Amino acid sequence: MSPVEIRDLERKAFQAWPALETRANFGWVQRFAGGYTKRANSINAIEAGAHFTPAVMAELERPYRERGHPPIWRLSPLAPAEADAVLAGRGYRRIDQSLVQRAPLDERFSPDPVVRIAASPGPEWLAGFAGLSPVAPHHRETMAQMLRSIAAPVGFASVEEGGEALAFALGVVDGDHVGLFDVLVAPAARRRGLARRLTQSIGAWGRDHGACFAYLQVVATNIAALPLYADLGFETVYSYAYRVP
């Protein structure tokens, strides 16, 4: 995937999971969301050839330290080639190697009658989603604020059985792509194909809203999800990792 294509997909993902505040400096985007998720509280290159000097590093990290948060660097292929080694030399740990995957929305993506997709997150959806996610109680309002601030067409998907919510996921359309985020299944309901049904339904929903491709971000060690995504035609187009103090 070319740098231009990577930048476009990065932009789509940023808008699909919006931070509460963003700043663009020196070819990097600083994202802030009160410490809720690394994705929304990280420093990200948005241009090939982004500046990376000691002075630039200090300036990019400063607002995080002032807020009492660790400066988290998210290194995609757009980051300067030396960034990973420089941060490692400063003692920053490399964590959560992740894959960005994409698939054409072909016949493998079809709506499932058990999957409900709403245009806005109601209180029950938010409570159920938060209950299955690792979000800390003090971050739940931030999470809700971020979800409500998504400007693109969004589908809040869920599966219920006997009045009990068993699974959730999020789909966000931007042009010809739909992003799939945070597929969560209750422990007691796993290994029943609910993640597949959510993924297929969100893909079909995205296609109905003009998308031709689905994309997602998945941790490279997620051995439960990777075979499912491969079966649905997802292929890795690039990867990224975090460096944290």
Regions found by a protein language model. Give the residues of each.
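Conserved active-site alpha-helix within GNAT-family acetyltransferase domains
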Residues: P80-R94, R196, A220-S239
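Conserved acetyl-CoA-binding loop-helix of GNAT-fold acetyltransferases
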Residues: T53-E61, D182-P187, R191-A204, D208, ...
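A short helix-loop-beta-strand connector motif used in the catalytic cores of GNAT acetyltransferases and
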Residues: Q15-E21, H69-P70, A83, I95-S98, ...
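Conserved GNAT acetyl-CoA-binding A-motif
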Residues: R67-S76, G206-Q217
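Conserved beta-strand in the GNAT
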Residues: F26-A33, R93-I95, V100, S158, ...
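Short amphipathic alpha-helix that is part of the acyltransferase structural core
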Residues: M1-E10, R39, N44, S98-L99, ...
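N-terminal charged segments
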Residues: M1-E66, A79-P80, H138-H139
